[in-house]
């Protein structure tokens, strides 16, 4: 009996500590945000065109690339907002009525990258995430969906999009974050929200 109780405590403590894993390793937003701020004129232009907050765009640039326009991830995400040509890039092209997908050189162009990344945020906001009422919850939902897909997020609430949105609208921003930390299949999802807040606070 004592052994079983000890095992239960180990599992419980492990679960509690895992909720804080999103803060590890530590991330100082000051330098990435400073580098991302140099692209603010482009971010403001793109934000105005697509109805997206330039501060949100800048925060995503800080998180995704640290302001480096030429960085390419191991998974093939490119540039300031780390867009994948075959997924988010293709979605933006389709939305614009274009065929194909952006090239690597196009995605390394700061203005094109920010424009397409901002367009993708707008597509998410007015598409899969349409109907979320709370602005901060929408912001959190946007960055989680930007990083890991809207479908993965919505399925943590319901397989039915309408029901998922209704459940999201029952939550405060803090409750939404807690739900993501507990239920999202991607461990980096709550960390992204945490990084977003760090970046916004550093501006």
Swiss-Prot record:
HAMAP family documented for this protein: EmtA
Keyword terms, alphabetized: Cell outer membrane, Cell wall biogenesis/degradation, Lipoprotein, Lyase, Membrane, Palmitate, Signal
Encoding gene (name): emtA
Protein name from the UniProt record: Endo-type membrane-bound lytic murein transglycosylase A
Pfam family for this entry, one: SLT
S-diacylglycerol cysteine lipid attachment residues: 16
Annotated function: Murein-degrading enzyme. May play a role in recycling of muropeptides during cell elongation and/or cell division. Preferentially cleaves at a distance of more than two disaccharide units from the ends of the glycan chain.
InterPro entries linked: EmtA, Lysozyme-like_dom_sf, Transglyc_AS, Transglycosylase_SLT_dom_1
One cellular component term from this protein's GO annotations in UniProt: cell outer membrane
Places the protein is found: Cell outer membrane
Organism of origin: Citrobacter koseri (strain ATCC BAA-895 / CDC 4225-83 / SGSC4696)
Catalytic activity, reaction form: Endolytic cleavage of the (1->4)-beta-glycosidic linkage between N-acetylmuramic acid (MurNAc) and N-acetylglucosamine (GlcNAc) residues in peptidoglycan with concomitant formation of a 1,6-anhydrobond in the MurNAc residue
């Amino acid at each position: 009996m004592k052994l079983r109780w000890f095992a239960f405590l180990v599992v419980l403590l492990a679960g509690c500590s895992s909720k804080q894993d999103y803060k590890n390793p530590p991330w100082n937003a000051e330098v990435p945000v400073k580098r991302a701020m140099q692209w603010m004129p482009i971010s403001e232009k793109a934000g105005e065109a697509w109805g997206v907050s330039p501060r949100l765009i800048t925060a995503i640039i800080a998180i995704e690339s640290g302001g480096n326009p030429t960085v390419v991830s191991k998974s093939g995400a490119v540039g300031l907002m780390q867009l994948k040509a075959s997924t988010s890039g293709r979605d933006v092209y389709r939305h614009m009525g274009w065929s194909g997908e952006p090239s690597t050189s196009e995605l390394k162009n700061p203005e094109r990258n920010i424009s397409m990344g901002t367009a993708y945020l707008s597509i998410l906001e007015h598409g899969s995430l349409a109907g979320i009422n709370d602005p901060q919850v929408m912001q959190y939902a946007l960055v989680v969906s930007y990083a890991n897909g809207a479908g993965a997020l919505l399925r943590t609430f319901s397989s039915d999009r309408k029901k998922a949105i209704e459940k999201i609208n029952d939550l405060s921003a803090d409750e939404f974050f807690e739900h993501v930390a507990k239920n999202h299949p991607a461990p980096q999802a709550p960390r992204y929200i945490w990084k977003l807040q760090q970046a916004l606070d550093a501006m």
